[in-house]
Structure formats: structure tokens, C-alpha cells
Amino acid sequence: MDLRLTYVFIVAILKGVLCEVKLEESGGGLVQPGMSVKLSCATSGFTFSDYWMEWVRQAPGKGLEWVAEIRNKANNYVAYYGKSLKGRFTLSRDDSKSIVYLQMNNIRSEDTGIYYCSRGYGGYSENWFVYWGQGTLVTVSS
């Protein structure tokens, strides 16, 4: 009986580890004004295709600013953007790889900041913005 309980306990732990939601941004760095940079957010631990994905940034010394959102297949992959971006940013996603991309063009000094991806809506509003990546720093400077 003890052996069976141990087995159940180990399986439960492994299941918890394997199902842990993870988001990991990459692609940041030093970028010259007017250039382009593409950020990526690799995810795991959930059914990526079910969820909307969000990008949020934080400029030095400022609060969080919502950047953009891309919805899921059920919502035709529609993307929405913050007004300050003026068509310079483009969101895309690859459901087969569970990755969301943020293409940033004609980058400006005011785009400097830490960029975070976050899991958005997936059918339950209480799950919105619960999971975040660690962020990737974009520094715009000549």
C-alpha cells in the first residue's frame, strides 16, 4: 500500500512540473533608432492555441503600458495595438510552436523598456494576465 501511495505522489509531482505554465521572452538588446527588432515569447504548460496573448512594456521609471494583443484561432487571430504605436508594431503567433512574436519597426527612444508577454483570455476572465514571462530589455540608443 505504501508503494502505491508513493507512486501516486511521484506521478502527481511530475504532472505538476510538466503542466507548469511558462513564458520566456527573447530577442531584446541594444537597437539603434529607426531599426527593427523582433521579440519572441516561447510558452509551455498550457494549450497555447486556446489563449489570447498579450505584450506589455515598462519604460524606465514608469508604470506598465499595454502594447498589443493577438487573439486565438477562434477569434481569427485578430490583433489590437496601443494607440501610441502608430502602426509600427506587428504581432503574430505560431500555434504549432506555441510562440508569439512582436515585430517592432522604426524603433524610437521612447520604445526603450522591458517587454513582457502574458497569457490573456482563454475562456475564463480570472485567468487573464495571471502568467507572465521574466521580460526582455530593449534599449534604443545610437
Swiss-Prot record:
Instruction: Say if the entry is tagged with keyword Signal.
Output: yes
InterPro entries associated with the record = Ig-like_dom, Ig-like_dom_sf, Ig-like_fold, Ig_sub, Ig_V-set, IgHV
An example of a Pfam family matching this protein is: V-set
Q: Name one GO molecular function term.
A: antigen binding
All disulfide bonds of the chain are none
Task: Enumerate the Gene Ontology biological process terms.
Answer: immunoglobulin mediated immune response
**Keywords, sorted A to Z:** Adaptive immunity, Immunity, Immunoglobulin, Signal
Q: Which GO terms describe its cellular component?
A: extracellular region; immunoglobulin complex
Q: Which residues form the signal peptide?
A: 1-19
| Protein name stated in the entry | Ig heavy chain V region IR2
